[in-house]
């Protein structure tokens, strides 16, 4: 089953994502107000889906807005993942958009 990992998920990413609601420092994340959620398949990091319902800012000084979506670490889990997505277990990016500001 999909398990929600609420805090301290290590994902080995570089960089830093900041918003007023969230701090994601590359080693884990803080899900303070439910903006970002990690879903891990069978409590093992085979598939990592980052569900984002807000605009994320990378390096607030340059104002680049972007969306991070991680998925597809194991091809064999995709049918099960899509089954969960389609069944509504994950709220999946219906009003999130890409916007780039220089």
From Swiss-Prot:
Species of origin: Saccharomyces cerevisiae (strain ATCC 204508 / S288c)
Transmembrane segments: 38-58, 64-84
Domain of life of the source: Eukaryota
Keywords, sorted A to Z: Membrane, Transmembrane, Transmembrane helix
Topology of the protein relative to the lipid bilayer: Multi-pass membrane protein
UniProt miscellaneous comment: Almost completely overlaps YLH47.
Subcellular location(s) per record: Membrane
Name this protein carries in UniProt: Putative uncharacterized protein YPR126C
GO cellular component: membrane
């Amino acid at each position: 089953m999909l398990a929600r990992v609420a805090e301290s998920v290590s994902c080995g990413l570089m960089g830093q994502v900041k918003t007023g609601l969230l701090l994601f420092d590359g080693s884990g994340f803080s899900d303070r107000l439910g903006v970002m959620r990690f879903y891990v398949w069978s409590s093992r990091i085979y598939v990592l889906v980052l569900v984002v319902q807000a605009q994320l800012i990378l390096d607030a000084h340059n104002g680049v807005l972007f969306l991070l979506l991680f998925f597809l670490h194991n091809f064999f889990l995709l049918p099960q993942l899509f089954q969960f997505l389609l069944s509504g277990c994950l709220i999946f990016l219906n009003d999130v958009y890409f916007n780039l500001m220089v």
